[in-house]
């Protein structure tokens, strides 16, 4: 049996399901979900370092999936990818990704191109002005590792505009 091929097929199926979930309608928070908190990025300024390690625990530089509430109605939301930019104990700090092209040119969003986190290969954008605080146990899965150059571009924006180190 070719385990490598089988694993690749399983990952492909997972990415397909997640891409469909990204386009899914809003829904209430999942049962037992402790909640995602949001804060202005400057209020969570800290040292940022690239440290991905696909070991089952989310680390800075990894893109993970979790349920994210809508700003206009926090009781509704959907599964979204987040770039992990920090951690404190079991809490992760993440920046939300979007594949909506209306984000292009918006100063609160930075383009990072496409990657394994989006099965359809769409260009993605990371929101800079809103940090999401997520419990480690609320992460649905690890999605991908953002390469060092793109992570550094995001980190430079956080340092230059929001006081991160």
Region roles according to the model:
Residues 1-25, 114-165:
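C-terminal terminal-subdomain/extension
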Residues 28-44:
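Short, basic/aromatic beta-hairpin or loop at an interaction surface
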Residues 47-53, 70:
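Short alpha-helix capping/helix-loop boundary micro-motifs
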Residues 54-55, 75:
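An N-terminal domain-cap segment
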Residues 75-79, 84-116:
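Compact nucleic-acid interaction/catalytic patches
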